[in-house]
Structure formats: structure tokens, C-alpha cells
């Protein structure tokens, strides 16, 4: 297949090479006619998604395009003068020209160079001068119409062997005699922009005897059938790519095709109608099916037209040769850089993550980030990541299905580094699982522990908590994080064991949980809040407008930072442990209370449930052993805790009883399969029972019984009446109970 040389591509104007033409309502249709001798039909190959292809042999086919008159943004009007160069001069009268009404403002080109075809747009049809090239019947004929907006002439370069020297004025279609050998003309119709962005391309076979003018008719046409193909486009159009480049091949041989079929495949946005009519026959409507690219089945391939868009502003198209397609995915390889730490922003997460980025030093290491491709490989064996030995305690949640690997940290001189080996796909990660999947079973992990997920997990990446946070487990699913003063400091979470209720249980007060806080105006973000001071989240507390929870993690971290700015040792334990053998704790430093009497929670001694000592610098202290105020407050605190426990137990018992009542099976509604006893207590039965009771009362009165004896006799009679009703219900299920008193 011969491809048009690069000189032709260079001569083509910019409008042809442009694909991003913005047209608002442009329904213009482009038609390109290519003719070659001794060929009845030529298949067409294109890269477009939809093709309209109509072919016929030996029949006169005329293509009419119906479109609405819409306003275009280009506002160009005028005519297009089509000229071509014949392969050789011929004495027989044969020429063709096509006049298309376009819009104005076109530039004309000077005299064409040898081997070129110049297409100029003129203002009116009368401007077709006598200098137009003559199209001979044995040559190739190219008719180009409606190429969108175009203000420059179109220059086509043909081989020198096909260029003739004869130039005859052509203003109309000349008469074609029947003795001339008919030519095969391919009419390629390229639709303009449509709403779906896919142009329509159609091709039909014509002969030179089938192109006539309105004034002259050929006798040959009187015996031939005429087929009319109409394509209506009324749907609103949008901007899209247009045909930019044509690669036209010469016919390999002049043998006619053995099979000739007509295949139509198109899809218009507005549902156009495609009709094919013959003179003397009723019109037939053909529905247009939305199918893929099809071509004319033929035994031999002679002509091929490959159409490919070029210079697309949004994407680059690479041609495929021999059926080899380019891959549909791209791999992004990170640049080689020193090991560093990058902060990861996870949407919707309250925690801060740090990703350890590897340097691409090894040649066989796998990039840490790739775009998802069609083939994915599971993770290989997870290799350890060595980090610096900073005093950090991490409690990391994992899913039970994953494997946990503990890595002993080693001291390094640099910051966080990663040890890479020769095995590919080495990664360590902490899975970002939701809070509902956090398991409180990793409280005894050493400082600096790094967890690796099982191979085959989805999101792969490093997630390491910063050093200024220490995680704590609260109840069963919450994670409490307390800020650290620095890398060398320790927190209360490392020195005090934690319990399930309210987060913390101190070693001395292990018999009871910490009392709930009662903060009202501090938002639980002050140091005198027990929960906040001990690095806990509030749970089962009596506080109002609490911000010491996961929902307000940002405000909580700001408060922690403010406290650390004022006092770097704010979250350190205020009361240290005593020596071995001593039961009482000692002060790390004394309190400095002045007006609270050391009976408030912001007093270190009172908060730790110990008395003030000589180290304290408090004024008006009441926190000593014989202080009645201290005893009263302690008793009140104990009573409050007991009351809370009792209320919790009562609520739990009540809820369990309610659940038992709801789940208890209902008693059977039928007694022996019949009516229930109370259904027999009708109005008549009630009246008869009352009469029996009155009769029993009269009998007791005649016997001069006492009041108590009379009441006893009446109650006994009432019991006998009820037993009769019950017995009657058991015997007669449908009949009413007859009672005789």
C-alpha cells in the first residue's frame, strides 16, 4: 500500500490537520470522491467507530444530503471550486465538476506547482475560471466538499506519472457517450460533528456515466436504475474531532470484486431515517443499527482508505502495525531520591500517617507507586523496615486474618531509613482499617514495633504513627492518643496500667474505676479534667459539650499542643512510684495550690488520692488525713461512684428483663383447640352468677351469719360459678354454658 508522501502532508493547510475545531451547530457533511479505472468496488478501512458504506455496481447512485440551515461560528460563505489533474490527455469528452454552496472569505492560492491539485473557494459559481484542470476519465477524480470551516485553499500533490498537461475550462458536467469505458468513482461522505462526537463516513460506487448536470442527460441513464440515498441530520451537534488525514492507496490490480453487498451501520443522536428508493417502487425505510466497524466483504482487496485523526489536543494516538496494539496502561516510576518521610493525608481519618519512601538504589526493586494495570501481582514476602530507636510505644490495630511481624528497632544515625534487599516487592504496612475492626490485643508490643500485612492485601503503603503520639486502648474499639512532650519523654500511659472502664485504672485504685468527669465549660480540654490529663477519651462521664473524643480530634490536638507549650511536662505523671517495699507513693514535685484548699482536681495531690506533704507549697491546705472537709469530699466521691455503678446495674438488669419479655414465646391462645373460658362469660352468664351470689347472701342472712361468714359464703359461691364456667368451656366448645343456680 502506497502512502501519501510527507510533502503532501506538509502542503495540506492547517484546517485539515486541526481536530479541535469548535462548532456550535455545524451539520456540514464532507464528501470525498476517488475514482480508479476497472474497479467496481473498493473496500474501506477506517479507525472510526461507525461507518456508513453503500456500494453498488452498474447502477446509477446519487447521494443527497439533507441538513438544516444552522448558524455556524465561522460565518464563512462562498463556493468551493474543485480542480484536479488527469493522468494523461484524452480526446474523448469527459470531465466532472462539483459545485457546493459554502460561505465567504476564502484565500486563493497562486498557480499550482507541478504535481499539485489546488482547491480554492470562490465567492460564487461564476468565478470558476477557465484555468481549472481537466479531469480525464482514465485518471483519478477527487471531489472534496464541505470540509468544515476553511479560509485557505487546499493543495493536494499527486505523483508525476498521473499528472496531465491538458487544461480545459470546465463549468458544467459534459455529456458522456455510451461508448466510453465507464469509470468507477468512490463517493466517500464524511459527516460533520454530531452530538456523540463520532463522524459518519459513507462510500458509494459511481461511474463516470452516472454524473450528469441538470441541463444534460445521457441516453445511458434512461436504461439504468437510479438509487437515492438520503441522510437526514436534525439532532443538535457538539464539537468533536473531524477527519484529518487520508491515506489513499493505488489499486493492486484491476480485477473486479466478486462479491458486492450493501452494508449500512450508523447511529445518529436524533434517530435519523435512512431510505433507499427506486423509480416506480414504493420507498422502503431502513433502520440504522448501532453496531461496530464493518467493511464490505470481498475476495480481493484493491483500494484502502485509512483515516486517522492527528494532532489531537487532548490525547496522542499511536498507530498500530500488524495487529500489535500499544498497552492501555502506563507505569509511573518514581525518581531516585534519598530516603525521606512524607506525610499522608487520608480523607475522613482523624489520624496522621507518615509514609516511608524508598530510594530506587537497587536495580531490581519495584516502584512503590504504580497505576493499576490489567495484570496485578500479589505481594511477596514482607521484609522488615528498620527505623531509629526512638522511645515510641505503638498499639496498632490489625485484622485477625493478617499476620503480625515484630521487628526489633536498631539505632541509626540518620532519620527513618529503609533496608532494601535483592528480593522485589518488599513492603511493610499498617492496614488502615475502620475503628470497628480494631482489636485490643496488642498492648504489650515493644516500642518501635512495625506491623506487616499479609500478602495479597489491597492498599499497599507505609503507615507509621508519628513519635509524638502514644496510642491507648479504650474499651473494645476506641483508640486514645495522648501527646508526648518529646522523643525522650515518657507518658502516663507507659507508667500506669489501663483498664476497660473509662480508659484508666491506677495500680493503687484498681478496685474501682476512675470517677467520671463533670466538666461543663472547659470542653474537657483542660488539665483539671481527669480524662484529658491522663490521655483518655471521655466515656460514661457527666460532662457537657465534651470535645475529648474522636469526633473533635483536631480541637483536642490543639489543646494538647497548647498545654505542652506552657508546660513541657504537663502530661508526665505527677506522682511517681515509691521505692521497693514502700506501699505509699511519693511526690515527684509538690502542689502549689492557693485558693482551692487542695480539694480540687487540678491539685496534683488530691487528684492522685494522696495527702499533701512537706514538698508542697500550697496555702490553706485541707488535704491532710484528719481534715473533715477531705473526708466529706472523699465520701461524696465514693457515694457518687457507687450510685453510678448501681444505676448502671439497674439499667442493665431492666434491659435484660425487657429483652426476655420480648423474646419469651407467647402462651397458646387456644384451649384444647376450642374457645377460651372467658369467651363463655356472656351477659346471661354474668346475670346468672349475680343472682346466685344474691341468693347466697339471703341464705346467710336468714341463718343469722356474721358479716365475715356472709362474705366467705358469697366468695365461695362465686368460686363455684367460675369453676362451672371453666368446666363448661372444656366440655361444650361451641355451645354457651348453661348455668343453674
From Swiss-Prot:
Main location class: nucleus
Gene Ontology CC annotations of this record: nucleus
Residues annotated as site: Critical for interaction with target DNA: 528, 602
UniProt subcellular location: Nucleus
Name of the protein in question: Protein lin-54 homolog
GO molecular function: DNA binding; metal ion binding
Entry's family note: Belongs to the lin-54 family.
Record function comment: Component of the DREAM complex, a multiprotein complex that can both act as a transcription activator or repressor depending on the context. Specifically recognizes the consensus motif 5'-TTYRAA-3' in target DNA.
Family matches, as SMART domains: CXC (SM01114)
Sorted UniProt keywords: Activator, Cell cycle, DNA-binding, Metal-binding, Nucleus, Repressor, Transcription, Transcription regulation, Zinc
Domain CRC: 513-626
Residues under site feature: Interaction with DNA: 566
Residues holding Zn(2+) 1: 517, 519, 524, 529
Residues annotated as binding Zn(2+) 2: 517, 531, 538, 541
Entry note about domains: The CRC domain mediates DNA-binding. It contains two CXC subdomains (joined by a flexible linker) which are both required for efficient association with target DNA. Each CXC subdomain coordinates three Zn(2+) ions.
DNA-binding: annotated segments: 515-528, 591-604
Binding partners and assembly: Component of the DREAM complex.
Chain residues that bind Zn(2+) 6: 598, 612, 618, 621
Pfam families in UniProt: TCR (PF03638)
Alphabetical list of PANTHER family matching this protein: PROTEIN LIN-54 HOMOLOG, TESMIN/TSO1-RELATED
Binding locations of Zn(2+) 3: 524, 538, 543, 546
Amino acid at each position: 500500500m502506497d502512502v501519501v508522501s510527507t510533502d503532501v502532508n506538509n502542503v495540506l493547510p492547517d484546517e485539515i490537520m486541526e481536530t479541535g475545531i469548535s462548532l456550535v451547530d455545524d451539520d456540514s457533511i464532507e464528501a470525498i470522491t476517488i475514482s480508479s479505472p476497472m474497479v467496481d468496488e473498493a473496500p474501506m478501512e477506517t479507525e472510526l467507530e461507525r461507518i456508513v458504506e453503500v456500494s453498488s455496481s452498474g447502477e446509477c447512485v446519487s447521494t443527497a444530503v439533507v441538513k438544516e440551515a444552522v448558524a455556524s461560528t465561522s460565518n464563512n460563505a462562498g463556493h468551493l471550486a474543485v480542480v484536479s489533474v488527469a493522468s494523461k490527455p484524452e480526446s474523448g469528452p469527459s470531465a466532472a465538476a462539483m459545485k457546493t454552496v459554502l460561505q465567504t472569505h476564502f484565500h486563493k492560492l497562486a498557480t499550482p506547482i507541478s504535481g499539485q491539485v489546488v482547491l480554492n473557494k470562490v465567492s460564487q459559481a461564476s468565478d470558476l475560471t477557465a484555468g481549472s484542470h481537466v479531469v480525464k476519465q482514465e485518471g483519478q477524480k477527487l471531489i472534496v466538499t464541505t470540509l468544515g470551516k476553511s479560509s485557505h485553499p487546499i493543495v493536494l500533490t499527486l505523483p508525476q506519472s498521473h499528472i496531465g498537461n491538458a487544461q480545459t475550462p470546465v463549468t458544467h458536467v459534459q455529456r458522456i457517450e455510451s461508448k466510453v469505458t465507464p469509470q468507477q468513482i468512490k463517493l466517500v461522505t464524511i459527516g460533520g460533528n454530531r452530538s456523540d462526537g463520532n463522524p459518519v463516513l459513507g462510500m458509494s460506487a459511481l461511474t463516470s456515466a452516472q454524473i450528469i448536470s441538470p441541463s444534460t442527460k445521457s441516453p445511458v441513464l434512461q436504461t439504468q436504475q437510479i438509487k437515492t440515498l438520503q441522510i437526514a441530520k436534525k439532532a443538535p451537534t457538539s464539537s468533536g474531532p473531524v477527519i484529518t488525514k487520508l491515506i489513499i492507496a493505488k489499486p493492486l490490480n484491476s480485477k473486479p470484486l466478486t462479491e458486492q453487498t450493501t452494508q449500512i451501520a450508523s447511529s445518529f443522536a436524533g434517530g435519523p431515517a435512512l431510505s433507499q428508493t427506486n423509480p416506480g417502487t414504493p420507498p422502503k425505510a431502513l433502520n440504522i443499527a448501532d453496531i461496530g466497524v464493518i467493511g464490505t466483504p470481498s475476495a480481493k482487496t484493491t483500494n484502502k482508505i485509512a483515516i486517522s485523526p492527528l494532532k489531537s489536543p487532548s490525547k496522542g494516538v499511536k498507530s498500530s502495525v500488524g495487529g500489535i496494539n500499544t498497552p492501555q496502561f502506563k507505569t509511573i516510576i518514581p525518581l531516585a531520591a534519598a530516603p525521606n518521610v512524607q506525610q499522608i493525608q487520608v480523607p475522613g481519618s482523624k489520624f496522621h500517617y507518615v509514609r516511608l519512601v524508598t530510594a530506587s538504589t537497587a536495580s531490581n526493586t519495584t516502584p512503590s507507586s504504580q497505576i493499576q494495570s490489567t495484570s496485578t501481582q500479589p505481594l511477596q514476602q514482607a521484609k522488615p523496615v528498620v527505623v531509629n530507636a526512638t522511645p515510641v510505644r505503638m498499639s496498632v490495630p490489625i485484622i485477625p486474618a493478617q499476620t503480625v511481624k515484630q521487628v526489633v528497632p536498631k539505632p541509626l544515625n540518620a532519620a527513618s531509613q529503609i533496608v532494601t534487599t535483592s528480593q522485589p516487592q518488599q513492603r511493610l504496612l499498617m492496614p488502615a482499617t475502620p475503628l470497628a475492626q480494631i482489636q485490643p490485643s496488642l498492648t504489650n508490643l515493644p516500642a518501635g514495633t512495625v506491623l506487616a500485612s499479609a500478602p495479597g492485601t489491597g492498599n499497599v503503603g507505609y503507615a507509621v504513627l508519628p513519635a509524638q503520639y502514644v496510642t491507648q486502648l479504650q474499651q473494645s474499639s476506641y483508640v486514645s492518643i495522648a501527646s508526648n512532650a518529646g522523643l525522650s519523654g515518657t507518658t502516663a500511659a507507659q507508667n500506669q496500667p489501663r483498664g476497660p472502664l473509662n480508659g484508666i485504672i491506677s495500680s493503687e485504685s484498681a478496685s474501682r474505676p476512675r470517677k467520671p468527669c463533670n466538666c461543663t465549660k472547659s470542653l474537657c480540654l483542660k488539665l483539671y479534667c481527669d480524662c484529658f490529663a491522663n490521655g483518655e477519651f471521655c466515656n460514661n462521664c457527666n460532662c457537657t459539650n465534651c470535645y475529648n473524643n474522636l469526633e473533635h480530634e483536631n480541637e483536642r490536638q490543639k489543646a494538647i499542643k497548647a498545654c505542652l507549650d506552657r508546660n513541657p511536662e504537663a502530661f508526665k505523671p505527677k506522682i511517681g512510684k515509691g521505692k521497693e517495699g514502700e506501699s505509699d507513693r511519693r511526690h515527684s514535685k509538690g502542689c502549689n495550690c492557693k485558693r482551692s484548699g487542695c480539694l480540687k482536681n487540678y491539685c496534683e495531690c488530691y487528684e492522685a488520692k494522696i495527702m499533701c506533704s512537706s514538698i508542697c507549697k500550697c496555702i490553706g491546705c485541707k488535704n491532710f488525713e484528719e481534715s473533715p472537709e477531705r473526708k466529706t469530699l472523699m465520701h461524696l466521691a465514693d457515694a457518687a461512684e457507687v450510685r453510678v455503678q448501681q444505676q448502671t446495674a439497674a439499667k442493665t438488669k431492666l434491659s435484660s428483663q425487657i429483652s426476655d419479655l420480648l423474646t419469651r414465646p407467647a402462651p397458646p391462645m387456644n384451649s384444647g383447640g376450642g374457645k377460651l373460658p372467658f369467651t363463655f362469660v356472656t351477659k346471661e352468664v354474668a346475670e346468672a352468677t349475680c343472682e346466685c351470689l344474691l341468693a347466697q347472701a339471703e341464705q346467710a342472712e336468714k341463718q343469722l351469719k356474721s358479716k365475715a361468714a356472709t362474705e366467705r359464703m358469697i366468695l365461695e359461691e362465686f368460686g363455684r360459678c367460675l369453676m362451672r364456667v371453666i368446666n363448661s368451656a372444656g366440655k361444650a366448645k361451641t355451645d354457651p354454658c348453661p348455668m343453674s343456680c
